[in-house]
Amino acid sequence: MHISTIKTAGSSGMSHMNEAYSSTTATEMVARGAGSEIIHTEIDSNGSKELAPNGAQSRVQKPSEDAVRAPYDYIRTLPSKRIRETFIDALDSWLAVPAGSSTSIKSIIGMLHQSSLMLDDIEDDSTLRRGKPTAHTLFGTAQTINSANWVFVCAFEELRQLRGVDAATVFVEELKNLHCGQALDLHWKHHTYIPSVDEYLNMVDHKTGGLFRLCVRLMQGESSTSCHHIDAERFITLLGRYFQIRDDYQNLVSDEYTNQKGFCEDLDEGKISLPLIYCLAGSDPTQIMIKGILQHKRTGEMPLSMKKLILEKMRSGGALNATISLLKDLQDDILEELKSLELAFGSGNPMLELVLRRLWI
C-alpha cells in the first residue's frame, strides 16, 4: 500500500496533493500549509519501507549490513572470559528476571562492552586486543568508529524489548556517565595531568562503574521479586573500582596481559593509571624525569628501555605495593558488602562470590 507524506514545494503543490489522494488506496497526510508535494513511502508485504520520491519507480532498498557490522563481528570472535554474562546470571538468582528480559540485558551489555572496546582501542592507539590485531588496524579507523556507533544504536533498539518504564532513562544516564568518565581519562592523558587518587576514583566510578550500574538497574527494573528496590550501589561502585585498578596493575606486571596487549601497554598509550599516580606523587628528581618522559612522548610505542625504567621506579618507590594493597582492601570491602546484600535479599549467593574470587589477585 502507499502512504503519502508532505514536503514543502511550489505553488502547484495542492494539485499534486489532490492527484496523490485520488490515486492512493490508503493515504496519511500531514498538512504543513499551502504549497506541498507528495513523497510516497511504500511498505511491502514483509513490512520493510522503500522510498519512491514523487511517486517515481526507483526505490531506496535497505542496504546490506555486512560492512557496518564487520568490525563488531570480528571483535566478538576474540577470546573472552564472559565475566559480565556470568555476573548477570549470578545476580539473577536474587532478582529473578524473566528469561526474555535477561537475554535482552545480556545482549545490551555485551553490545555496549564490545562497542566501547573498539573505541577504546582507537583512542588508546592500541594494536593488540586479547592477543589479536585490534579492529581498527584491520578495518580502518573510520569504519570501526562507524561500526561502534551502529552497535550503540542496536543496543538501544534491543532496549525496547524490556518492560521497565525507566529503562530508556537508565540507559541514557549511565551512558552519559560512562562517556564523561572516559573524557576525563582522555583529558588527563592528553595534557599529562596527574590527578589525585580521589579524582581518579571518581573517574573510575563513571567510566567503569557506569556499565555495571546500567546492568544492575536494568535488571532491577525487570525483576519479578519484591527485593528489586534493594540498594546495591556501593557494591557496584566497589566492584567497578576493583575491575579498573586490577586492570591497571595487571597491565604492568601480568605475563598474560603482556601476551595479549604487549609489555606495559598502558605506558605506550600514555595512560594515567593508579600505579603511575602513586609513582608521581611527589617532586623528587626521578618523578620529574618520568613526568618529562610522559610529556614528550609521541604517538606509538614507548622505547622498551624507558618502560623498564619507569616500571622499576614504580617497584622501588612503592607504587606497585600501594596498588596491590588497595586491591586487597577492596577485596575485603566487596566481600563485606556482599554479606550485607545477602542479608537484605534473605539468601546467599555462592555463584556471585565465586565470580568475585576468580578475579582476586
UniProtKB/Swiss-Prot annotation:
> Organism's domain of life?
Eukaryota
Among the GO biological process terms of this entry, one is: isoprenoid biosynthetic process
Documented EC number(s): 2.5.1.-, 2.5.1.1, 2.5.1.29, 2.5.1.10
Protein residues bound to Mg(2+) 1: D120, D124
What are the alphabetically sorted keywords of the record?
Answer: Magnesium, Metal-binding, Transferase
Pfam families registered for this protein in UniProt: polyprenyl_synt
Identify the CDD domains for this entry.
Trans_IPPS_HT
> Per the annotation, how and in what number is the cofactor bound?
Binds 3 Mg(2+) ions per subunit.
**Catalyzed chemical reaction(s):** isopentenyl diphosphate + dimethylallyl diphosphate = (2E)-geranyl diphosphate + diphosphate; isopentenyl diphosphate + (2E)-geranyl diphosphate = (2E,6E)-farnesyl diphosphate + diphosphate; isopentenyl diphosphate + (2E,6E)-farnesyl diphosphate = (2E,6E,10E)-geranylgeranyl diphosphate + diphosphate
Q: Name one GO molecular function term.
A: (2E,6E)-farnesyl diphosphate synthase activity
**Listed InterPro entries:** Isoprenoid_synthase_dom_sf, Polyprenyl_synt, Polyprenyl_synt_CS
Q: Does the keyword Metal-binding apply?
A: yes
**Protein name per its UniProtKB record:** Geranylgeranyl pyrophosphate synthase 3
Q: What is the lineage of its organism?
A: Eukaryota, Fungi, Dikarya, Ascomycota, Pezizomycotina
